From Swiss-Prot:
Cellular component GO terms held in the UniProt record: cytosol
Protein name, per record: Argininosuccinate lyase
EC number per UniProt: 4.3.2.1
Species the sequence originates in: Lachnospira eligens (strain ATCC 27750 / DSM 3376 / VPI C15-48 / C15-B4)
GO biological process, one term: L-arginine biosynthetic process
Encoding gene, per UniProt annotation: argH
One Gene Ontology MF term: argininosuccinate lyase activity
Highest taxon in the source lineage: Bacteria
Family classification: Belongs to the lyase 1 family. Argininosuccinate lyase subfamily.
Classification via InterPro entries: Arg_succ_lyase_C, Argininosuccinate_lyase, Fumarase/histidase_N, Fumarate_lyase_CS, Fumarate_lyase_fam, Fumarate_lyase_N, L-Aspartase-like
Cellular compartments annotated: Cytoplasm
Entry annotated with the keyword Lyase: yes
Amino acid sequence: MKLWGGRFTKETNELVNNFNASISFDQKFYKQDIEGSIAHATMLGKQGIIPESESEQIVEGLKGILADIESGKLEITDEYEDIHTFMEATLIERIGDAGKRLHTGRSRNDQVALDMRLFTRQEVLNTDAELKELMAVILRIMKENTHTFMPGFTHLQKAQPVTVAHHFGAYFEMFKRDRSRLHDIYERMNYCPLGAGALAGTTYPLDRELTASLLGFYGPTLNSMDSVSDRDYLIEFLSALSTIMMHLSRFSEEICIWNSNEYRFIELDDAFSTGSSIMPQKKNPDIAELVRGKTGRVYGALISLLTTMKGIPLAYNKDMQEDKELSFDAFDTAKGCISLFKGMIDTMKFNNKRMEASAKNGFTNATDAADYLVKKGVPFREAHGIVGQLVLMCIEKNIALDDLSLDEYKAVSPVFDEDIYEAISLQTCVDKRLTLGAPGPEVMNKVIAIYDKYMEEN
């Protein structure tokens, strides 16, 4: 069955049929196609555009098709051009001529615009739910590690001491912003294109407010040409997914570094690691590496759709069919990565002693030594130079700042006194950082309370 062909005098070339067909991938939103058709048929009946008895017959027929697909009784086959053709043909086969009235006042242009919007709307919600679960794991790790010291890095060099709670809090903030972007996308996209027709609406007295309400939208879209050609919501969602994947990729890179023999900050669970076919000793962070690798795949979907849309005149063009495969793949890839990442960090173990020892080395307390001098009246720029001399002395002797004698301190600056050792201890360096957003346990607990409230309210 074709939904068109009356003005054609030749059969379509088989290669053209195969090239044009989309059922191999758009069958993914069979449920949304049925939901949209049920709403449309219900509205047609209430408006008196078709008899209510036939509207009810169509609705029941569509519900039966949905039940049979989901039970496995009915298989979607690729002999049809697209999911819309399959649905209409199956409906007519089951209920007869009444099924031929379903497409009254509707085009495949607004039908597919609706289906994709319904499908994407649910994917936005699904992704948001996955992110929230990941954030719950991050928050649990934060609560358990407010006093677990580790080095903080800049330029991948040790900089200042922080805690695991503080480090993981940075990712909590990233994913919080990601969720905010998803919520914004939902607000903008949640308007119904059904009733836009091919591009110029229809002469039938459709009740677009009713169909929008039945489908859970805030209301109908306001321009029929934009309605059938808008893919902004998809571009926005793919952009948000790309940002999520970028955050996961950064996190994955750190997991790979921390898991290396040179760092040994963490131990990944066996269930989330793999081995080598030749090297018996290997325990590889493949999940983190694959998440990092799949980031480019999601980026590619975004760039592909932007490129597809950049030269398309109003309104609908067949180019837009290319939005589906790449979007479906990106949706599944991002959700899968979030879910696996959650399991990986939920089961990994921290090597607290190793991290603390690493935090004590590398002069992470040098800034605190400079601050010590500032509090005793030395201008910061002078203090910076003094501590730089001390660091050079330590490097030459292969010792830490803590290992210098008081005489060695005083030889560089007489301002130093016995209390320098307490001032540059790891505990003090972290505990004294009490500005909001810093790693000090006291302020960290306040931030955790804020995050708890966020998780309850969002």
